[in-house]
From Swiss-Prot:
Positions of Zn(2+) 2 binding: D54, H160, E172
Catalytic site: H58 (proton donor/acceptor)
Pathway field: Amino-acid degradation; L-tryptophan degradation via kynurenine pathway; L-kynurenine from L-tryptophan: step 2/2
Top class in the EC scheme: hydrolase
Binding sites annotated in the UniProt record for substrate: F18
Catalytic activity: N-formyl-L-kynurenine + H2O = L-kynurenine + formate + H(+)
Domain of life: Bacteria
Organism listed in the record: Bordetella pertussis (strain Tohama I / ATCC BAA-589 / NCTC 13251)
This protein's UniProt keywords: Hydrolase, Metal-binding, Tryptophan catabolism, Zinc
The protein, known as: Kynurenine formamidase
């Protein structure tokens, strides 16, 4: 059996969220008793918690919700590239060493250990010119091990609008701590949420050989 790497952080009430966004909450609506045959919970959360896929609706009014987005970009050959210690922005030169034969999906690891217990503002993000550089090499999906492809302080979301122009897809909040640089199969399908601006994903990598 081919090896799997789970690259989705655990989701719980302790999961960090963007300041002001909705945290994970869970309460039990039904409990297993002699009069009730099941446990059933109610969950409230932002669709941007944990590993998730943004929809075009997230950064453009009237654009496609996540349930209308094609699934093909979220499944297939993928390259993990290490840019550990790259600083606030991932630049093309941080990825150039791994550009030969680039597959359509690229995930970038920026940290030795993803921040899973608390929110941090100074995470690494993609420079817009890096989106252009990747799009020019046929990349259709990008991912990152931080909460956003844009800096936390950004009000213009330049990298999000760069992927909009190129009709690219994005995965954020991945956990790549245990993943070596190299090629894998990505499986990270979003839910068919017909009105949502994003969806949680259970993202995994599978070895190719």
């Amino acid at each position: 059996m081919k090896r799997l790497w789970d690259i989705s952080p655990p989701v719980s009430a302790d999961s960090p969220v963007f300041p002001g966004d909705t945290p994970y909450r869970q309460q039990w609506k039904w409990s297993l008793t002699p009069d009730c045959p099941v446990n059933v919970s109610e969950i409230t959360l932002s669709p941007h918690i944990g590993a998730h896929a943004d929809a075009p609706l997230h950064y453009e009014n009237g654009a496609a919700a996540i349930g209308a987005v094609a699934l093909e970009p979220f499944l297939g050959p993928c390259r993990v590239i290490h840019a550990i210690g790259c600083g606030p922005l991932i630049l093309p030169e941080h990825l150039a060493h791994a550009q030969a034969g680039l597959p359509p999906r690229v995930l970038v690891r920026t940290a030795r250990h993803a921040a899973l217990q608390w929110w941090v503002d100074d995470f690494s993000a993609y420079a817009p010119q890096t989106i252009e550089w990747l799009a020019g090499r046929g990349v259709t999906l990008i991912g990152i091990d931080t909460p956003s492809i844009d800096p936390a302080s950004s009000k213009t979301l330049d990298s999000h609008h760069a992927i909009r122009r190129h009709d690219m897809r994005v995965l954020e909040n991945l956990r790549l701590d245990d993943v070596d640089e190299g090629d894998y199969e990505l499986i990270a399908l979003p839910l068919a949420l017909v009105q949502a601006d994003a969806s949680p994903v259970r993202a995994v990598l599978r070895e190719l050989a």
